[in-house]
């Protein structure tokens, strides 16, 4: 099967290191090339071993996982998977801070007789091993972040009824920035499908709520869609918009390998809101959301996707581009500004 996926396991608990290694041993194509008990060792061993993926604990002696993540992403960028025993036992801002610093994903530590947790870990490691990470500078640089974009055509402004979003790997970071920048009087409801381990769904909503002037929470079946409110799709079910002004939560089958599915949400918004739907597909692996974005475009709504330059993984937006489902490609840093312009009735220029 070619070269094995090399993994560095970082955790101050010997038992946890052993359990992680045992879980990864279930896949013959994954090789643990090193283990260590603190962040300082992790930085040194990353430079020496150049692993494909690092599993990172947060709370460790000598150097914690956050500081180690910051050093690694600045000095030797490597896909980092943050592991935690229980999201509810730790302040969510600590775990999610690792994502802000460049870690790619969150996962539950495997326990004895872990079962699904072990296989979820293996699956995540295999996925992250193919991600091309970027260097995260430890000090912000001055000057313009992006060159000016040249418009190739002009789209009419959209009367915004609802904003629906699909995101996966790298999505929490983009959502955090988007929601932290949107004003409290943003005039449309926002509904988001973010692929994440079910155990992290509630803490994700809390983390995003703490950054935003909007009211952010997990969606509940039958609740109203209101301006200034952001609903996060709960795990294990599909979130839909069955009719205007109301959200629905329903059981079903996976779509594009996911439940909740971004495509299911976006298609329901296309049916219900038509031209007043704004669809947004952000960074992520796979193709979820692409067919849903096409449905919004065909219904006369506005179809927006994150550009390759700013994606951790261009899979989902790339699939939308391949389907010719995208009206407008934007940088991940420009999502909030784009939505505000639409809300003000301004036209968007299309360019890559």
From Swiss-Prot:
Residue numbers carrying 4-aspartylphosphate: 57
Transmembrane segments: none
Keyword Cytoplasm tagged: yes
Residues forming coiled coils: none
Keywords (A to Z) from UniProt: Chemotaxis, Cytoplasm, Hydrolase, Phosphoprotein
Gene Ontology BP, a term: chemotaxis
Modifications the protein undergoes after translation, according to the UniProt entry: Phosphorylated by CheA. Phosphorylation of the N-terminal regulatory domain activates the methylesterase activity.
Compartments, record wording: Cytoplasm
Residue stretches making up the Response regulatory domain: 6-124
CDD domains per UniProt: CheB_Rec, REC_CheB-like
Active site per UniProt: 168, 195, 288
Protein name according to UniProt: Protein-glutamate methylesterase/protein-glutamine glutaminase 2
Species whose genome carries this gene: Myxococcus xanthus (strain DK1622)
């Amino acid at each position: 099967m070619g070269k094995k996926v090399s993994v560095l396991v970082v955790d101050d608990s010997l038992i946890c290191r052993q359990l992680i290694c045992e879980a990864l041993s279930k896949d013959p194509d994954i090789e643990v090339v090193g283990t260590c008990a603190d962040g300082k060792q992790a930085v040194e061993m990353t430079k020496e071993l150049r692993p494909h993926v690092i599993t990172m604990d947060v709370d460790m002696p000598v150097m914690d996982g956050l500081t180690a993540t910051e050093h690694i992403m600045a000095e030797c960028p490597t896909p980092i998977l943050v592991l935690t025993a229980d999201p509810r036992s730790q302040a969510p801002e600590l775990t999610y801070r690792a994502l802000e610093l460049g870690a790619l994903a969150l996962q539950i530590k495997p326990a004895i007789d872990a079962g699904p947790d072990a296989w979820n870990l293996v699956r995540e490691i295999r996925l992250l091993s193919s991600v091309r990470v970027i260097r995260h500078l430890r000090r912000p640089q001055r000057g313009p972040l992006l060159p000016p974009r040249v418009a190739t055509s002009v789209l009419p402004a959209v009367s915004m009824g609802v904003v629906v979003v699909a995101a996966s790997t790298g999505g929490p970071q983009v959502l955090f920035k988007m929601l932290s920048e949107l004003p409290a009087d943003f005039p449309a409801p926002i509904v988001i499908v973010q692929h994440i381990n079910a155990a992290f769904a509630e803490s994700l909503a809390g983390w995003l709520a703490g950054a935003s002037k909007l009211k952010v929470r997990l969606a509940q079946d039958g609740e109203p869609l209101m301006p200034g409110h952001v609903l996060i799709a709960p795990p294990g079910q599909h979130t839909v918009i069955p009719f205007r002004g109301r959200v629905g939560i329903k059981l079903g089958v996976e779509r594009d390998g996911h439940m909740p599915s971004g495509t299911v949400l976006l298609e329901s918004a296309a049916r219900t809101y038509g031209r007043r739907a704004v669809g947004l597909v952000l960074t992520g692996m796979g193709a979820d959301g692409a067919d849903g974005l096409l449905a919004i475009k065909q219904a006369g709504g506005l179809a927006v996707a994150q550009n390759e330059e700013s994606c951790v993984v261009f899979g989902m937006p790339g699939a939308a581009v391949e389907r010719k489902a995208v009206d407008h490609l934007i940088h991940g840093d420009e999502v909030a500004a784009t939505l505000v312009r639409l809300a003000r009735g301004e036209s968007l220029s299309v360019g890559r």
